[in-house]
Regions:
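Membrane-helix interface/capping segments
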Residues: 20-36
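Cytosolic juxtamembrane amphipathic/interface segments immediately preceding
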Residues: 33-39, 170-175
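Membrane-interfacial segments
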Residues: 25-26, 30, 65-69, 93-101, ...
Length: 219
């Protein structure tokens, strides 16, 4: 059980504790240093290297859920641990979604595949950044709004926004929403392939873990 719930423990207990012990770091790079750092490929490689680690962890978790001795509780806890990893991957996707390269956009989608949150790749750079902190932005919380009020509004609203944005982009090019060039359909197809593969490897026993990890990562 302790191993299965390792993700939430690290994310919500150990890292915040270390953060408190280390304290605030007030040393920020200068504008000149930032320009040099942006040109250093090390940081881009560091971000991208998380994706194969993410997939290896998800595949291993599916292997564990396929074992007969793995209890339902352990499957749920494993799902939470994978949700913690795939939630971090949404941050990875965020960084890559702002790049101009189509390869980076594909990698952004791959990072979002386990969570199934692929519409984020479209909505965040083209919707949220355009309307941030305005009433029209589903990704900005309202004053006094609780987390549980904000969560369904942002998930549903961001999904609708992404569909509208991608539909408008395709329309400008004279293409149908159902075109093979639809980035949302491409991302959702990858998600379908991933989850079908995990079920094929682990069987129906993986359903609780896969469902929990997806929900937990988005939260």
């Amino acid at each position: 059980i302790l191993f299965a719930m390792g993700g939430p423990l690290v994310l919500h207990v150990i890292i915040p504790r270390i953060d408190t012990l280390v304290g605030a770091d007030n040393n920020n790079p200068s504008p000149e240093e930032i320009k040099l750092l942006e040109q250093d490929p090390y940081y881009a490689r560091l971000v991208k290297s998380f994706i194969p680690i993410q997939y290896a962890a998800n595949i291993y978790a599916c292997y564990l859920t396929a074992r007969k001795e793995t209890s339902l509780l352990d499957k749920v806890l494993l799902g939470m641990s994978m949700g913690a990893i795939n939630g971090i991957a949404i941050n990875t996707a965020h960084e890559l979604s702002h790049k101009a390269s189509s390869l980076d956009h594909l990698l952004s989608h791959l990072a979002l595949v386990p969570s199934g949150y692929n519409h984020f790749r479209v909505e965040h750079p083209y919707g949220h950044h355009k309307r941030a902190a305005t009433p029209e932005d589903p990704a900005s919380s309202k004053m006094g709004e609780t987390f549980y009020e904000f969560l369904p509004r942002t998930v549903i609203g961001s999904f609708k926004s992404a569909v509208e944005i991608e539909g408008a982009r395709l329309k400008r090019k004279g293409l149908s929403f159902w075109s093979k060039h639809n980035e949302l359909l491409q991302g959702w197809s990858l998600t379908g392939i991933f989850h079908s593969s995990m079920l094929g490897i682990s069987g129906r026993g993986a359903v609780p873990s896969l469902a929990v990890q997806s929900a937990y990562s988005i939260m």
